[in-house]
Amino acid sequence: MKTETGNKINIRFIILICIISKIMNAQTLQTVPSVDLKKYAGKWHEIASFPMRFQKGCHCTTAEYTLSEKGYVIVENRCNRNSVNGKQSYIKGRAFVVPNSGNAKLKVQFFWPFRADYWIIDLASDYSYAVVSAPNKKYLWILSRTSTMNETIYQEIVSRLKEKGFEVSKLQKTIQSKV
């Protein structure tokens, strides 16, 4: 009887530890302190990302951000399907800054009423690259102002992501044209 009770307590304790670990993991992801949206606006090239169903077969993936007069950010994502010369896929949405986030946390909306987290977790001081994720770490994009990135810089970013608890082995480099 004592063994059965002890096992129940151990199982409950293990479950509790797993739940706390999951909660703490979500809470520990930090964004950059602040983002100047005027500097952030413009065209970004996807250098690498975690595989996403909606991006399957995408090459030459870009995102363009434009500040609207109404206070939100216009988001335009493009990619060429199945090859660098494939048919272009396009989607337009809006991003809304989360209050008191230093502009580093946004909610992106492509289809009403759904919004997704867009957290800027790493950003070059000259805005030459950015890393975007969500608090659950299921999404990850490494972005650059150019279609290629210096391999040393890329590896430094990947190293920082590993320190933050990301499964960097899931990262896939995006095929970009040299145009």
Label every PLM stretch briefly.
Residues 3-13:
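Bacterial N-terminal signal peptides that target proteins for export
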Residues 12-22:
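Bacterial N-terminal signal peptides
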Residues 22-179:
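A beta-rich soluble binding module of mature secreted/lumenal proteins
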